[in-house]
Amino acid sequence: MAPWSIDELHGPDGEDWRVPVGELESRITELSNNLAEAGIEAALIQSPVDLYYYAGGRQNGALLIPAVDSAASTEQGGDGATFFVRRSVERAKFEAGAGDSCLEIQKFPSLRIFAETLTNMGIDGGISLQLGEIPADFGQKFKSALAPLGEGKDCTAIVHHQRETKSDWELEMMREGAKVQRQMFEAVKQSVTLGATELDLVAAAEEVSRRHGFGGTVQMRRFPLQCDRAVIASGRAGGVPSFFDSAIGGTGPHPMAGMGSGFTKLEENQPILVDLVHVHRGYVVDATRMFSIGGLSERWLERLSDMVEVSDSVVASLGRGDDCSKAWQIGSELAESMGYGEHLMGMQPDQSKFLGHSVGLQLDESPVVARGFDRPLVDNGVMAIEPKLVFNDGSIGVEDTWVKTKQGMKRVTLDDSYDLIIDC
């Protein structure tokens, strides 16, 4: 049998699902300039998420990006950004654009001579590592190997800040993801029947998502890096807390997966909260809608209407350029004035203290609509706004993913044509 070929690396119906080379080039150039402004010689990118962001794939390796004023940069006559790959070099070349790539790609040298290799490239100073992303022992190993070059700073915040602003291409990926996500909600709708379990509904949503290219993992920034991307909680299960820092815990199927959907069966006149994430070519969209069998009581409907009002207040605040902490204050104080202080985003003592989280390649990006985030959402920043209420007999709320524009906030996920509550 013939060896594998790059012709086998494609999206559906032969589509090229690689990140455009122009995207990679502009991202690397921006980071190179940011490093120079911060007085950093070069950054070594090793987080899989950021390797995809800058190199177009997450092969096992380390991507060196010199500052624009470093002798190793292309601007100063050096080789520029170089991806040192352990495996697979051939896939790394293809994913970075093959013959059009803006990267140098080579086999990772022995770690014993890595510092010398970088010196020969023109590096003259400490290398900045992603110490806020990589495991401590892994980071220490590289700090020791690169010590001859000098002390290096942590570049985690620089990379995170750059990724807050999404390009037009990234926003298009999210819009495409939202189309698939809508089909996921429709699949859930078709599966809502008396006696079905939460996991039955998850399976219906998963089938749609997988069929459209979901890779199986929702990337998280915060330890323990775990998330269930389809959280469906019915009735009293919606009031069960979990380890996960979000409004809705859920029973999960067993203690090792102790969050999200479980074996709770659907009943009449109970709130069924459906929180679905889809990831399209790496990019997250997040939305929540309510379902029921036979309708909900006026009290539940009033609660949902109130959360829509809270969501609108947060969206308006972010849209006019308020700090995210101000948006939190406005939304949480409104909810408290409605009498929901002990039920907003969970019940005491397990309440979460946020009303929205940025999304992109990861579900939990920054900034967050919470106390302490004293800065606005940037233009082309993307945020999932999700005020929810939790009671002993269930949970209810709304969530959509929004993008900040110069004209204000625009919804990326389900539009007004999709009901906030679907009675099946």
Predicted features, each with a name:
Residues 1-424:
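Active-site neighborhoods and metal-handling regions in enzymes and metal-associated proteins
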